Each structure stands twice: as structure tokens, then as C-alpha cells.
């Protein structure tokens, strides 16, 4: 067995952990069997966070967690775990992000299962070529003619930091949106002028 180091590319590396997809791909290319992922908690216990559980589910491997403060180990394995709440989730690409929180809202509030959409394994690949405009119609969301007549449950396609349509939020009524930005916690926020101007397209679910 060997240990293959991978970079943490999260913006806040003290609070978040995100594997570098290029390092991960290089590890896979070596041809050996991947047994799991090892990472540390600088402060606090080795108890798996929701982000650890979500990451383990997403990549399909155990997470071995070491607490630097307490000098202890823990492990979490894929088991079908899902985040218990729509609010306060840690961001994990493909498992807890802007799209999955919308899918989970539809399941929890309307008992609607949005079909699985196969996305790139890394956020970097997705940001280079966002696919929401092509995927939403295939998932039974109809594009609306205007962005100023939104209703509860509408998906708002927004311009991201790279000037591409790479972020989605859900309008939940009362001038509020539910969304999950990269490397932040999922939250409800006021649909203010900044978000209104960022919204370029609106999609409505039509069974």
C-alpha cells in the first residue's frame, strides 16, 4: 500500500476540503486499487462532518479522518447517507451543491424525483462548460419567456464569476431564494438586486 498526496483546492482550506481532480486522476492512472481517502481535521474531533459523509458518498470510497488536536482516527464509508436539512449544508461538488439542494427541495416539498443528471466529476470541468441550459429542458423544466414573473419553485439560472451561466437558485416565495454557492453553506437569502441582475433565465417544472 502507498499514500498518494492530493492537493486541497478549497478556497477556505481550514474549513473545507476538496480534492484536486487532476491529482485524483493521476492517482487513478497509476493502475492500482484505490482503498480510500485520508484527510485531517486540524481542530476538533475525528468525527465525520456532513461534508465528509457527502464526499464519501460521492466518490464511493471510505474517508479516513485524523484529528490533529486529539490524535485520533475515524472512518466513514459510503452507506446511502443524505444531508438531513436543506439549510446549512457544506458544499461538496456533485453531492451537496447548487443543483442537488434544488432536487432535494422538490423531493421534500412536492415528492417529485428529478431524474439523475450525469455531470463532470470536477467543478473545474463544469465551470469551463456549464450545461444547465441543455440539461434543464431534458429534466422537464420549461424555459420562461421573461425573468420578471417568477413563481415559487422556479429555477433561476444565474451568471457565475466566470461570466458563464454556472449557478442555479430556487425561488421559494416571499422574495427569498434557496441556493448553495461553492465553498459556502446552503442557505435562504433575499432575492435582492444583485441576484436579480445575475438571473439570466428562469425555468419552471412541468411534469
State what each model feature region is.
Residues 1-34, 42-79:
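Conserved beta-strand-loop surface patch within small alpha/beta domains used
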Residues 78-89:
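Active-site-adjacent structural segments surrounding the nucleophilic cysteine of cysteine proteases
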Residues 91-109:
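Active-site nucleophilic cysteine motif
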Residues 111-123:
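Short acidic alpha-helical/loop segments enriched in Asp/Glu that coordinate divalent cations
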Residues 120-187, 191:
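...with weaker cross-activation on analogous glycine-rich loops/strands in unrelated enzymes
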Residues 189-207:
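Glycine- and charge-enriched low-complexity intrinsically disordered segments
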Amino acid at each position: 500500500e502507498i499514500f498518494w498526496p492530493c492537493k486541497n483546492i478549497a478556497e477556505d482550506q481550514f474549513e473545507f476540503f476538496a480534492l484536486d481532480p487532476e491529482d485524483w486522476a493521476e492517482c487513478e492512472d497509476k493502475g492500482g486499487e484505490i482503498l480510500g481517502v485520508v484527510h485531517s481535521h486540524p481542530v476538533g474531533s475525528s468525527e465525520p462532518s456532513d461534508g465528509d459523509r457527502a464526499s464519501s458518498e460521492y466518490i464511493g470510497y471510505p474517508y479516513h479522518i485524523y484529528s490533529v488536536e486529539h490524535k485520533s482516527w475515524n472512518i466513514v464509508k459510503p452507506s446511502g447517507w443524505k444531508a438531513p436539512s436543506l439549510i446549512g449544508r457544506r458544499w461538496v461538488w456533485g453531492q451537496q451543491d447548487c443543483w442537488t439542494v434544488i432536487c432535494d427541495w422538490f423531493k421534500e416539498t412536492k415528492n417529485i424525483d428529478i431524474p439523475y443528471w450525469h455531470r463532470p466529476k470536477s467543478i473545474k470541468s463544469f465551470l469551463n462548460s456549464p450545461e444547465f441550459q441543455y440539461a434543464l429542458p431534458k429534466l422537464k423544466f420549461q424555459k420562461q419567456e421573461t425573468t420578471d414573473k417568477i413563481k415559487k419553485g422556479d429555477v433561476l439560472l444565474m451568471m457565475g464569476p466566470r461570466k458563464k451561466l454556472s449557478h442555479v437558485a430556487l425561488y421559494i416565495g416571499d422574495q427569498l431564494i434557496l441556493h448553495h454557492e461553492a465553498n459556502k453553506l446552503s442557505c435562504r437569502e433575499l432575492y435582492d438586486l444583485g441576484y436579480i441582475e445575475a438571473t439570466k433565465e428562469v425555468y419552471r417544472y412541468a411534469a
